[in-house]
């Protein structure tokens, strides 16, 4: 076993002495050593309770005959980091998380890992680490937050964090008072857990379950339910079974598993950020991933779940309706899933889902009666985005699926947000936000503030926004991100000028700057990149080494 390097033999007496300094007994040191990553902190609602999950995981490892060794990890709350310099660091933290888990697992010769995570960049960071290290590993999430209840509406319809973001726009446009918004902010996030809709964190937790790196229930069991604690114990027991059978991530994270993940991604209407994270995870797993796969799979996988921000239902409803296993079961009935893929249970995807069924056909619709005939995401190509750009088509109102309008050009999110809040954006406009890509931002900030204000002002049915930055999983409307190549790398989005007509056709998967190619080339011939916004520290190094969003924004 790997841990023999720190436990067994005469030469390892100093190593054992150090373990004994922490209270480990000889009996514990004669068992497999399992690393437990616990990124608990008191800054993220989705991570504030992870000590409870970690305690349960450790109990599960002990129950199955292993010895847990817990270590910490960082985590950024995207909501708190939103709309200021902190958001530059969110995506970049994904690589730090992956690197730090690799360091801890390798330095201490763990035989297996249980990686606890829950929020936006922590989940993909942990998955990237699992693929890279390739020792028996189980991912266990902390679970979703429950939805809040609207304090300003009779019978209290469900609300979540995005309701509050959109409330800012409603106040700006006079549709809501500040007092009403204050009441809403008190009620929108009533428990710990990852934010309640199908935003990035829950998207990735659900896809972790589909890929096979998380146990059934991982994606949807709410944070505050006792069954989440039981699942954490089972995760600890499962990793011991994997160690015994030598089941590793490379056996689980196969091309077929990623195809399954994309299929369920389309059925659920997941965050556009999955189009960043799945390629990055696949890169670590040595699996080829092309953005065109999204359109190919979306064309044959219908959209079955209308979850917030694209609909009324929340993750707690999806859990009640049968969860991810019920979605898989429905897709399996129509031969849309590879059922042979192995999972952390030691069983196949098909075996895990064999007893699942849809318990609420309005939350999880059948393939015959979907919300939309195509899946949740689409990748658009054209002269403004030769390498592609991404939109959550399931959250776009029908009239905006095909749109053309004048470009309103901004070289930062801050400029765009101010213009929107000042009422300078009109119906029909196409807001262009550039120099916010992985290199240009740097860090590819989420544009939740401008898109939420647009929605809160009631303009989401009339205004589009395109950017080389990205969007929160909570974004809705004609919000088109990940434009590649980005402006900082000389992508043609840098050539767009105020008033240029931009044509968007989501059904046809096209986006075009209505300017002759000769003119675009002439504009770019006179273009020079702006000075870097950050010249020292981690983000300066990140900007120099990060790849295009079309490649998952991985750091080489």
Curated annotation (Swiss-Prot):
Molecular function GO terms recorded:
2 iron, 2 sulfur cluster binding; dihydroxy-acid dehydratase activity; magnesium ion binding
Q: How is the cofactor bound?
A: Binds 1 [2Fe-2S] cluster per subunit. This cluster acts as a Lewis acid cofactor.
Record key words, sorted: 2Fe-2S, Amino-acid biosynthesis, Branched-chain amino acid biosynthesis, Iron, Iron-sulfur, Lyase, Magnesium, Metal-binding
Q: Which residues carry this modification: N6-carboxylysine?
A: 121
What pathway does the annotation place this protein in? Answer: Amino-acid biosynthesis; L-isoleucine biosynthesis; L-isoleucine from 2-oxobutanoate: step 3/4; Amino-acid biosynthesis; L-valine biosynthesis; L-valine from pyruvate: step 3/4
Primary enzyme class: lyase
Which reaction is this enzyme known to catalyze? (2R)-2,3-dihydroxy-3-methylbutanoate = 3-methyl-2-oxobutanoate + H2O; (2R,3R)-2,3-dihydroxy-3-methylpentanoate = (S)-3-methyl-2-oxopentanoate + H2O
EC code: 4.2.1.9
Which interval of the chain is the signal sequence?
Answer: none
Instruction: Give a yes or no for keyword tRNA processing in this entry.
Output: no
User: What transmembrane ranges does the database entry give?
Assistant: none
Q: Which residues form a coiled coil?
A: none
Function, please? Functions in the biosynthesis of branched-chain amino acids. Catalyzes the dehydration of (2R,3R)-2,3-dihydroxy-3-methylpentanoate (2,3-dihydroxy-3-methylvalerate) into 2-oxo-3-methylpentanoate (2-oxo-3-methylvalerate) and of (2R)-2,3-dihydroxy-3-methylbutanoate (2,3-dihydroxyisovalerate) into 2-oxo-3-methylbutanoate (2-oxoisovalerate), the penultimate precursor to L-isoleucine and L-valine, respectively.
Regarding protein family, the annotation reads: Belongs to the IlvD/Edd family.
Q: What is this protein called?
A: Dihydroxy-acid dehydratase
Origin organism is: Desulfatibacillum aliphaticivorans
